[in-house]
From Swiss-Prot:
Known function: Scaffolding protein in the dendritic spines which acts as immobile postsynaptic posts able to recruit KIF1A-driven dense core vesicles to dendritic spines.
Protein name according to UniProt: Protein TANC2
Associated disorder: Intellectual developmental disorder with autistic features and language delay, with or without seizures: An autosomal dominant neurodevelopmental disorder characterized by global developmental delay, varying degrees of intellectual disability, autism spectrum disorder, and delayed language. Some patients develop seizures.
Keyword terms: ANK repeat, Autism spectrum disorder, Cell projection, Disease variant, Glycoprotein, Intellectual disability, Methylation, Phosphoprotein, Repeat, Synapse, TPR repeat
Main location: other
Variant or mutagenesis effect after changing R760C: In IDDALDS; reduced interaction with KIF1A; impaired neuronal dense core vesicles transport; no effect on dendritic spine location
Species whose genome carries this gene: Homo sapiens
Gene (name only): TANC2
Length: 1990
């Protein structure tokens, strides 16, 4: 109800407002509306009712509860379809908000008329079922209708007010717009209740006229049940099905009903009744009437629901709307629940054969022809019972008269079951033949039944079943309930306008359109789309002849409707209809096959059917056997004689046999003689015999005759209460008592069967006919008098005290006319009987005008009743609710109902009354083409020149619609009078307008006629002017026809001399009119008649520009072919291409460019086509233009570039496209992006991507600038929905910055950035990892350990974190002990480190760097090589994280692990998501980021060869102290970018990201290793030897923990000449290392820095299996790298490694390493493990703490898994990689934002606002002199390297990095490692940085390798004492190389390399070996930790 009320508010408001004119008019207050249908109905006369329910057409129908003034209630005809929708939506929302409370709304006020309880219940019910009854219309009358079954609602039997007001009956809903589900539901509930109390109330009833008796008794239960049943079960259909709970409430709800007379009745027999849809309420009611079978009977799905009566407000969040269509509930009294079905198999077989035949003339349907009682209905019902609607048979079949509903067996079978063939001895069935044939016939029947999707029974005594609107509505309702057509049901739910099209209201207005558009077209479309089964479907229609009894004066009967529609039926939708033999002519227009059931002589099968039935009856009843056996026994002879006698008498009538056997069974007929004389000879005699037995005396029949008269006269079944009141309405005194009435009714119970809705229906139509009419010669005994019945019904209506509703008024008129009681009085009284009848009706009701204008009476008018209404005083100029509130005359003129128009004109209707649109009846008739009505109206002096509100006269309307005859007539009419009066509008104007109208619509005949008008008088009649424009539209005939594409008219006009260049009023010539619409054929015609193809309009536009602007490709091509100039400009300087771009027509743009249009043309404002395309926002057009040479950085005169325009217009796809194409982000871009979060994300992501790219190339400084610039541009507020995305992006930027800072030896800043990231994302293990790395680099081991422990908690499985943790723990231990001399060098591994330890710290560092560089490089190379294949596979690595190195990557989807732990696959091609490479999260978080990000970020960059790399080897020479400032050749840039040598492998990050890239890390490595190896010093030592200076070996001192060694930057000169000796000898004990580092720091600040740089730069220089410089296989190195210790050899123990490494790491060296690794090893490297196992293995191998952090986790490993293990996360990598990662992962994001090429270091620093100096000092306390340099950007330049910044080496970044890698030192390698860790590692996944994993991984891997190599392989002494120079130097080199090598390789290496890094030599060898191994092992790191971090 709530919903109803809502609907009322919505609709009601509208409709009722509009309709208010009809009924009481007042709209209900909202609450009332809410109240429910009930309330509506009950509401006093509220039109609202009608409004509310969908069905109600007019409030008229609505049962106005209280007297309402006429005029108010009419509703608009067409309910806005949206009401339901709106109501549903609102209700849904309210339901969600209020939950169950909604139902609790106090119904009290709502139903003021009812008792509170009842009200509430009904309210609930109603609330629940908002559908209007109309929809649900059942076959029964509305509750308020006198005939309605529904109990009246009024409590008081006599209550006058209540009369209709309280009725909840669906009827009232009828009025409502929809079908009235609501009412229906309501009624159901009421009915249920009523039924419940029916018994009691009946007892209470007094005999008097008290209504109460009938009220309560009135089948409350039945209707309720029925309703409930149907609705609840079967009808889950109802819009809001009633929740079961309603049931209960309903039951309790209203026991009392309204007086019958108060109930609305259906239309008149003619069916013309105007009853509102309300009228349908009857139907509704019937539809929902309770089943007589009792609630217990299993109903469709009703079962359990019913029982729970707490249905109450379970509608909690309010049920979503259900279908608002309600099927009629049919009940066929002749078919009882005990009926059996015998024979007829041949019929089904024949039907099946005909429907399947290929003969189109007969396969569309079958007509079953037979006389009354021959079993037609039984055949239909048998198919229904076996069909999907079989459960409804329980409603259709009546209970047997003997069975009381209470005792119905719930489980009993459906009616019409076939009897068991137990009596096969006598039963031959109808099957002539064998069991096989019988089986086939049985199959045919079942096959037919399975195809049945809808059915309809026409019943003459239930008028609604005979009306076309109900037929259409019912069929649609059943179709959508058919399981085979669920797609149709879904479509109706999806498209509410279809439901509104099928609402009863729409069906009344235009049943053909409703059926065609609501049923046939949707089904046809669904069938074409293969959404419904590809099989035949069948609709069954029984009793077409019955519908003819209610044929309307205007409109179709069901059979004529089908005859018109059958041509539109799809071939797979078949009909099976039945018709009586006497009326079979009505079906002659149906192209169906006919089957006759009454040709007994011709068809042996009929005889066998009869025989089988006789056998069945005799064998199933011992009584029959006893009564027909002559001597107590039955022999075959007797049987044969009897059966042949009965068959002969029956002539084929099953009904005759059934009734005869019933008489025999009951003993009324005893056949003791063989003459069988006692057997009645016909059906008529059977009825006579029955009546004689029932009414032995005439007086006994006279007692019941009035009841029969009323039943016969009624239009629909009446309840006992209604009949009782009607009987008493005929007597003034001495009324019949209720008990007496009940006795009489009991006597009639065998003839008037009580239906489930408690109404009474004749047992069979033939009995009803027998009571009314007899054939000649038949006895007239028991003949009834229908006139008397009509009289009683008319009196009953007249004596009702409340106001009758429209439907009842129409019925009253019908009964008055049929009663004709004044016949013969006119002469006596002197007054015409028609006047007296008019007085009668006028005294009986007030709503005459509303009744006259009711929807049904408008569309299917009853002329006689309408005349009576007019005589009674109805307003003939009454405004209806249709056609813009047009007067009745307008509507009838529009519909073409000549008799009604004549009637209205006869009574003086205003001939010029207009609707709200200004149209008069003449205009409507002319527009519809009804010449006869036009003539009638013109005779009544209708104004010919009347203009409607659009300025159109009747002549124009006729011309617009092509009605030539009407045009001719109107032109010949007399216009003089009107013309003179108006003075303005003349006939000539009208003719000119008519010419234009006809030309525009293509009516050549009218155009020709108007041009050839005879000119009788030049002055008065002007012929139409062919070149003039009209005064209405301002068009000439040619411009109008050309613009509408009317080719024939254009030809005609040109032939008649129309000027081809004649413009219309707006100055447009025909050529432009037609070009604008794209009619190239007419363009051709005009050009052939001399039009200029390059003609320009006022704005200078040519036809080509117009066509391009409108996107008409065909016309553009045609014009170009005709020589149109492509270079012409309009007045603004725009060309055709400019226009096409401005409107985004790609196909036209392509065509114009292909034809030579200039893509760089600038208009007068300097805007190129690209500017205009960017403004429009079509990315494809932009892409096309850029690909075809458009200047992407073109600036127009207002200083705007295409990118700025796209940003300003928020065209994200264009922004992404332009950024991908290299557009620069300038100040204007940022300004335009303000307050556009989606654009900001794209731009920031682009910056990030650029930073990642620089980082990958090792240009850490540039990368830092980018990140800092991005942070600077970060919006300060207003993130809105994108808050999470921005936060993730910022975290990634901060982590990336931290990584870069660390690589730049600005440890303080690095730490601060990581801390800021933690503030934003406290649970970020990547941030902890990054901070730990920064702290470790600045030798705050304890603090680093703390952060690592936090990280490992957050991500326990992260190997990088575990590795680093081990190292840091080891370093802490080492710091605590005085520096211990490094363990004796292990074979070769340690030797290099130890050998040189003391000689020179610097040297050592350099050596280390060299080693690391070479080994790393080699490893990287090797790894890359190995990786190449595996890189793609790497499971864990989020590929996405690194920007694609090469274009191929773009295509490949990158997978990145999301921080959440889920992997995301990014297709870089797709431009939808923008994630920073670093963070997956980004991508996932904000797909908004924009495709651009993905694409551009990930777009692989072409491989670059960095000069350094190109050189065969890198020459690392530690720069002098100041060297740090110098830029070292970086290891090969990202593999992609590298020269062929380096191309082999991208950094691991990239690798992972780019697995698909052509430049695979492997290849890169291979090339690198191949080319470099030869050139490289054979061993890092040799490189060191080459270095210009070597650090003197400092005494080994315990490194001070507090002291942060600033890595000395060793200038590693990659020389082609190996210096093995030096390298090998350089091994510095740990202590020495520390000291050296310290002293070096002070001595060589810059050199340390340099060293650091080189160290970090260490590239995995794995040769593919090559030997490291000194000849050792790179594999080992690679392995160690992977493991995280680049130089560690297997020989080295983990502990050793850790010690050395830890000091080394702590030392400046370490820092340097980090950068190197970071760069080359993206997180992807480390993480890249083929499997977790690999990672684990590698981690174990790496062993060193550093390694641990480096340890790759399989990137593929689930981030979730990783997450669980906090240790896994590699915070180190994380910080950097995160940043980087972020960019890679949100590839698009990073790429998208292009940082300004130059970032000032200061600016980047500023962004973070972290004091560099403090950071430096902190990090480089020990190296104080150096630290400033390192920390300071000034020295940074030197180290700008490929190092991935913060591990952010997006693929792109990496790719780009690589090229730089060669050039730059790998200082960033370490940071890469870090990077790797953070985002890449799965643990990190959660963080957005996880996106970057690939790059991070590689970085990490490098880093790890580097660290491992440096720390592990180099002696710790070396590390420390040289200040890590060695590490930085040799290792750095190695690392650098590693980093340079593809990240993947690094990762692999990391995995594969042993942790032992003790000796550089070993390391180198290992590296070379490892690199080989790396190559060998797929580098698909699963998602190395780094990767995930990244």
């Amino acid at each position: 109800m709530f919903r109803n009320s809502l609907k009322m508010l919505l609709t009601g408001g509208k409709s009722s407002r509009k309709n208010r004119s009809s009924d009481g008019g007042s709209e209900e207050p909202p609450d009332r509306r809410q109240s429910s249908v009930d309330s509506r109905q009950s509401r006093s006369g509220q039109g609202g009712i009608s409004t509310e329910s969908d069905c109600a057409f007019e409030p008229d129908y609505a049962v106005p509860p209280l007297p309402v003034s006429e005029g108010d209630a009419e509703q608009e005809l067409g309910p806005p379809p949206s009401v339901d929708e709106a109501a549903n939506t609102l209700m849904t929302r309210l339901g969600f908000l209020l939950g169950e409370k909604v139902t609790e709304v106090q119904p009290g006020d709502q139903y003021s008329m009812e008792v509170q309880d009842e009200n509430q219940t009904s309210a609930i019910t109603q609330r629940i079922s908002p559908c209007s009854t109309l929809t649900s219309s059942t076959a029964s009358p509305p509750a308020s209708s006198p005939c309605s079954t529904l109990p009246p609602i009024s409590t008081n039997a006599t209550a006058k007010d209540c009369s209709y007001g309280a009725v909840t009956s669906p009827t009232s809903t009828l009025e409502s717009r929809d079908s009235g589900i609501i009412a229906t539901l309501t009624s159901y509930s009421e009915n249920v209740e009523r039924t419940k109390y029916a018994g009691e109330s009946s007892k209470e009833l007094g005999s008097g006229g008290n209504i109460k008796p009938w009220q309560s008794q009135k089948s409350s239960m039945d209707s309720c049940l029925y309703r409930v049943d149907e609705n609840m079960t079967a009808s889950t259909y109802s819009l809001n099905k009633i929740p079961e709970r309603n049931l209960e409430t309903v039951l309790s709800q209203s026991v009392q009903s309204i007086p019958l007379y108060l109930m609305p009745r259906p239309n008149s027999v003619a069916a013309t009744s105007s009853a509102h849809l309300e009228d349908l309420a009857y139907l509704d009611e019937q539809r929902h009437t309770p089943l007589r079978t009792s609630l217990r009977m299993p109903r469709q799905s009703m079962g359990g629901a019913r029982t729970q009566q707490d249905l109450r407000v379970r509608f909690a969040p309010y049920r979503p709307p259900d279908i608002s269509l309600k099927p009629l509930l049919f009940e066929v009294p002749s078919i009882t629940t005990e009926s059996v079905f015998v024979g007829r198999d041949w019929v089904f077989h024949e039907i099946d054969a005909q429907l399947q035949s290929s003969n189109a003339s007969v396969n569309q349907g079958v007509v079953i022809v037979g006389n009354i009682g021959f079993g037609k209905t039984a055949i239909i019902s048998r198919l229904v019972a076996l069909s999907c609607h079989g459960t409804r048979m329980r409603q259709i079949a009546s209970d047997s008269p003997h069975a009381s509903p209470k005792h119905v067996d719930a489980n009993r079978e459906l009616p019409l079951t076939q009897p068991p063939s137990a009596h096969s001895s006598i039963t031959s069935g109808s099957c002539p033949g064998t069991p096989e044939m019988r089986r086939r016939q049985e199959e045919a029947m079942r096959r037919l039944a399975s195809q049945v999707v809808a059915y309809h029974y026409c019943q003459a005594d239930n008028a609604y079943t005979c009306l076309v609107p109900e037929f259409v509505h019912n069929v649609a309702a059943l179709l959508c309930r058919s399981p085979q057509l669920t797609a149709y049901r879904e479509q109706l739910l999806r498209e509410p306008h279809l439901q509104s099209m099928l609402s009863l209201r729409s069906c009344v207005q235009d049943p053909m359109a409703s059926f065609r558009r609501g049923v046939l077209e949707p089904l046809e479309n669904l069938h074409k789309e293969r959404k419904i089964p590809d099989e035949d479907f069948i609709i069954l229609i029984d009793g077409l002849n019955e519908a003819e009894f209610h044929k309307p004066d205007y409109g179709d009967t069901i059979v004529s409707f089908l005859s018109k529609m059958i041509g539109k039926f799809p071939s797979w939708l078949k009909l099976i209809v039945t018709v009586r033999t006497s009326l079979q002519e009505i079906t002659k227009l149906l192209p169906f096959h006919r089957i006759f059931l009454d040709r007994l002589e011709e068809n042996e099968a009929i005889d066998q059917d009869l025989q089988a039935y006789i056998l069945h009856r005799i064998h199933s009843s011992s009584e029959i056997q006893n009564n027909i056996s002559l001597n107590g026994k039955m022999d075959n002879t007797t049987f044969g004689k009897l059966s042949s006698h009965l068959k002969t008498l029956s002539q084929g009538s099953y009904l005759y046999l059934k009734l005869t056997f019933d008489l025999i069974e009951k003993g009324y007929l005893v056949l003791k003689s063989s003459s069988y004389k006692v057997v009645p000879v016909s059906l008529s005699e059977v009825y006579l015999l029955q009546c004689n037995m029932k009414f032995p005396t005439q007086s006994s029949f006279d007692r019941v005759m009035p009841l029969l008269n009323v039943a016969v006269a009624s239009l629909h079944p009446l309840t006992d209460e209604h009949i009782f009141q009607a009987i008493n309405a005929g007597s003034i005194e001495g009324t019949l008592e209720w008990e007496d009435f009940q006795q009489r009714m009991e006597n009639l119970s065998m003839f008037l069967i009580k239906r489930r809705d408690m109404t009474r229906m004749f047992v069979h139509p033939s009995f009803r006919e027998w009571l009314i009419w007899r054939e000649e010669g038949e006895k007239t005994k028991f003949l009834c008098d229908p006139r008397s019945g009509h009289t009683l019904l008319a009196f009953w209506f007249s004596r009702q005290e409340g106001k009758l509703n429209r439907q009842q008024t129409i019925e009253l008129g019908h009964h008055i006319l049929k009663a004709h009681i004044f016949k013969g009085l006119s002469k006596k009284v002197g007054v015409s009987s028609s006047i007296l009848q008019g007085l009668w009706i006028s005294y009986s009701t007030e709503g005459l005008s509303m009744a006259l204008a009711s929807l049904r009476n408008l569309y299917t008018p009853n002329i006689k009743v309408s005349r009576l209404l007019i005589l009674g005083g109805a307003n003939i100029n009454y405004r209806t609710e249709v056609l813009n509130n047009a007067p009745i005359l307008c509507v009838q003129s529009h519909l073409g109902y000549t008799e009604m128009v004549a009637l209205l004109l006869e009574f003086g209707a205003n001939v010029d009354a207009s609707s709200e649109s200004g149209l008069t009846p003449l205009g409507y008739a002319a527009a519809a083409g009804y010449l006869s009505i036009v003539v009638l109206l013109c005779k009544k002096r209708a104004k010919v020149d009347h203009l409607d509100k659009n300025g159109q006269c009747a002549l124009v309307h006729a011309a617009l619609r092509g009605h030539l005859e009407v045009v001719k007539f109107l032109i010949q009419c007399d216009w003089t009078m009107a013309g003179q009066q108006q003075g303005v509008f003349k006939k000539s104007h009208a003719i000119q307008q008519a010419l234009i109208a006809a030309a525009s619509m293509g009516y050549t005949e009218i155009v020709s006629y108007l041009l050839d008008l005879p000119e009788k008088d030049e002055e008065e009649v002007e012929r139409a002017q062919i070149n003039s424009f009209d005064s209405l539209w301002g068009e000439t005939a040619l411009t109008a026809a050309a613009g509408r594409g009317k080719l024939e008219v254009c030809r005609l006009l040109l032939e008649q001399g129309a000027a081809v260049a004649q413009p219309n009023r707006r100055g447009a010539v025909p050529l432009f009119s037609t070009v604008r619409q794209g009619h190239w054929q007419i363009v051709d015609l005009l050009l052939t008649h001399g039009a200029d193809v390059n003609m320009a309009d006022k704005q200078g536009r040519t036809p080509l520009m117009m066509a391009a602007s409108e996107g008409h490709l065909g016309t553009v091509d045609f014009l170009l072919a005709q020589g149109a100039s492509i270079a012409l400009m309009d007045k603004e300087g725009l060309t055709a291409l400019s226009w096409a771009c401005l409107k985004g027509h790609l196909s036209v743009v392509r065509s114009l460019v292909d034809n030579g249009a200039a893509t760089d043309h600038a208009d007068k404002n300097g805007r190129t086509p690209l500017d205009l395309a960017a403004f429009y926002g079509d990315a494809e057009v932009v892409q096309f233009l850029v690909d075809h040479g458009a200047m992407i950085e073109h600036v127009d005169y207002s200083g705007m570039r295409p990118l700025d325009r796209a940003v300003g217009c928020r065209n994200t796809s264009v922004v992404v496209t332009l950024l991908k194409k290299g557009a620069k982000i300038g100040p204007a871009t940022w300004a335009m992006a303000t307050s556009k979060p989606d654009i900001m994300i794209i731009l920031l992501s682009k910056l990030m991507e650029e930073g990642d790219m620089f980082y990958k190339k090792g240009k850490v400084k540039e990368a830092a600038q980018r990140y800092q610039y991005a942070l600077k541009k970060f919006p300060r507020e207003g993130f809105g929905e994108d808050l999470k995305t921005f936060r993730e992006l910022k975290v990634s930027l901060l982590l990336n910055l931290s990584r870069c800072r660390r690589k730049m030896n600005d440890f303080g800043m690095a730490e601060e950035f990581a801390t800021k990231a933690l503030e934003l994302k406290p649970k970020s293990y990547e941030a902890y990892y990054a901070r730990a790395r920064a702290k470790r680099s600045s030798r705050q081991f304890a603090a680093a350990l703390e952060d690592l422990n936090e990280a490992i908690k957050l991500c326990p499985n992260n190997r990088e974190i575990q590795r680093l943790l081990l190292r840091v723990e080891e370093e802490c231990r080492q710091m605590q002990q005085p520096q211990q001399p490094p363990p004796p060098p292990q074979p070769q591994q340690q030797l290099p480190e130890e050998a040189e330890p003391e000689p020179q710290h610097e040297d050592i560092y350099s050596v280390q760097d060299i080693f690391e560089e070479e080994y790393l490089e080699q490893d990287v190379e090797n790894v890359s090589i190995g990786l190449q294949t595996e890189a793609r596979p790497s499971q864990g690595l989020p590929v996405i994280q690194s920007p694609p190195s090469s274009p191929p990557h773009r295509d490949s989807a990158y997978i990145s692990s999301s921080p959440l732990g889920s992997h995301q696959v990014f297709d870089f091609r797709s431009s939808s998501s923008v994630g920073s490479p670093t963070r997956q999260t980004y991508q996932s978080t904000s797909p908004a980021l924009s495709p651009t990000h993905q694409n551009s970020h990930y777009r692989p960059s072409p491989p670059h060869t960095s000069p350094a790399h190109q050189g065969g080897s890198y020459r690392f020479s530690p720069p002098p102290v100041g060297g740090q400032g110098k830029e070292y050749p970086s290891p090969p840039p990202s593999p992609l970018r590298r020269g062929p040598q380096y191309r082999a492998s991208p950094p691991a990050e990239s690798m992972s990201v780019y697995r698909s890239q052509s430049g695979s890390p492997v290849r890169y490595q291979q090339e690198t290793s191949v080319s470099q190896l030869p050139g490289r010093p054979k061993s890092p030592l040799s490189k060191m030897a080459q270095r210009p200076y070597q650090m003197p070996q400092l005494p080994v001192a315990v490194p001070q923990q507090g002291l942060r060694l600033q890595p000395a930057k060793a200038q590693i000169v990659r020389s082609n000449q190996p210096s093995p000796a030096v390298h090998s000898s350089t091994v510095i004990p740990t202590g020495a290392y520390g000291q050296v580092a310290h002293s070096m720091a002070s001595k060589y600040q810059s050199s340390q820095g340099d060293i650091g740089v080189s160290q970090s730069r260490l590239v995995y220089q794995g040769s593919i299996g090559g030997i490291v410089g000194d000849g050792r296989p790179v594999q080992h190195v690679q392995a160690s790298l992977s493991a995280g210790a680049i130089c560690q050899h297997g020989g080295l123990t983990k502990e050793d490694l850790p010690q050395r490494p830890s000091s080394a790491y702590r030392g400046g060296v370490r820092y340097s390493q980090t950068p190197q690794i970071g760069r080359s090893q993206s997180a992807s490297y480390y993480p890249v493990c083929h499997s977790k196992l690999d990672l684990e293995r590698s981690s174990s191998q790496l062993g060193s703490p550093d390694v641990s952090h480096l340890i790759r986790r399989p990137i593929s490993v689930n981030p979730n898994e990783i997450k669980p293990h906090p240790p896994t996360p590699r915070p180190l990598l994380h910080s950097q990689s995160v940043g980087l990662r972020f960019s890679p992962s949100s590839n698009s994001i990073s790429s998208t934002s292009n940082l300004t090429p130059t970032f000032r270091p200061s600016s980047s620093i500023q962004q973070m606002e972290i004091p560099l100096k403090p950071a430096y000092e902190r990090s480089c306390d020990e190296l104080s002199p150096v630290s400033p340099t390192q920390g300071g950007y000034p020295s940074e330049p030197t180290r700008s390297r490929t190092t991935p910044f913060m591990g952010i080496i997006d693929k792109t970044a990496r790719t780009q990095q690589y090229p730089h890698l060669h050039q730059q030192n790998r200082t960033w390698a370490v940071s890469s490692v870090d990077t790797v860790l953070s985002p890449t590692s799965p643990g990190n996944l959660p963080q957005p940085e996880s996106f970057s994993p690939p790059s991070s991984i590689s970085n990490i891997a490098f880093y790890n390798k580097t660290n491992n190599a440096q720390n592990g392989h180099l002696l710790e002494d070396d590390y420390y004492s040289p200040h890590g120079m060695l590490a930085n130097g040799s290792r750095g080199d190695l690392l650098e190389r590693v980093s340079q090598a593809s990240s993947y390789p690094d990762v692999k290496v990391a995995r594969t390399l042993p942790v032992a890094q003790a000796y550089q030599d070993n390391l180198y060898r290992q590296l070379s070996r490892d690199s080989r191994q790396g190559q060998t092992s797929p580098i698909k790191p699963k998602r190395p930790f780094v990767e995930s971090n990244v």
